[in-house]
Regions:
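Short hydrophobic/aromatic-enriched beta-strand-loop microsegments
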Residues: 168-178
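A polyanion-binding, active-site-adjacent surface
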Residues: 1-147, 154-162, 166, 184, ...
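Short, loop-centered acidic/histidine patches that primarily coordinate divalent metals
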Residues: 151-154, 176-179
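Short, charged, surface-exposed secondary-structure boundary motifs
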Residues: 178-189
Length: 207
């Protein structure tokens, strides 16, 4: 790790491992090939706490029905994602079709503040093999290999096209605006973004 960086690994906590196990048993059963939806890396108030991408403690209890001692504030990206999931038909329908994760299952802090791995050019280059290995490992669970959705249209798109696509070679990659960007800068258009998410995912799923 570069000087001043630290790793955020939610899976070192027993309650997080229990939550993730409960979630997978409840929502990821069966042998269906799910569409991968990739984010960046865990943030402090979402997956960094719960171990589940774009899921804060509130969504964990209220939307997924999983009780836990994990506490934390409402996280904007989780708020958007679970609004979208509700529009899709609810968690059971959504996770029947979709596997949602991140390019890196570990989060990163610099000076105690959340950072995306691509925000530091040197660190970004060094983390590429780790990201590819993590994506391949998750794909081996039985995910679709022909298509995916990526939540990010700026630096994450550039990272995908430069480093990931040559390795995983998806035939179709659909890029959507990141939930954080929507909630911070385009919140008044949230309904339009929810519709665009649901439409894009349903089109790729074939529903």
């Amino acid at each position: 790790m570069p000087e001043g960086f630290s790793v955020m690994n939610p899976y070192e906590h027993a309650d997080v491992r229990r939550v993730v196990t409960t979630f997978c048993e409840r929502y990821y059963g069966g042998s269906r090939q799910r569409l991968p939806v990739w984010g960046i890396n865990p943030g402090r108030y979402g997956a960094g706490l719960t171990g589940l991408s774009f899921t804060d403690p509130n969504a964990l209890r209220q939307d997924l029905g999983i009780e836990s001692a994990i506490v934390g504030r409402r996280e904007p990206s989780a708020e958007f994602i679970y609004t979208m999931i509700d529009a899709y038909g609810g968690p059971a329908s959504y996770y029947h079709d979709v596997y949602m994760s991140a390019l890196s299952p570990l989060g990163f802090l610099r000076g105690g503040v959340n950072i995306n791995f691509y925000d530091d050019a040197g660190f970004m280059r060094e983390i590429v093999p780790f990201v590819i290995d993590c994506m391949r490992a998750q794909t081996s669970y039985g995910l679709r290999t022909d298509a995916c959705v990526v939540l990010g249209t700026g630096k994450l798109k550039q990272f995908m096209e430069r480093y990931v696509q040559p390795e995983l070679q998806y035939q179709k990659v659909h890029y959507l605006e990141h939930p954080r960007y929507i909630m911070q800068y385009r919140r008044r258009f949230i309904d339009d973004y929810v519709t665009s998410y649901v439409t894009a995912i349903r089109d790729l799923v074939g529903n």
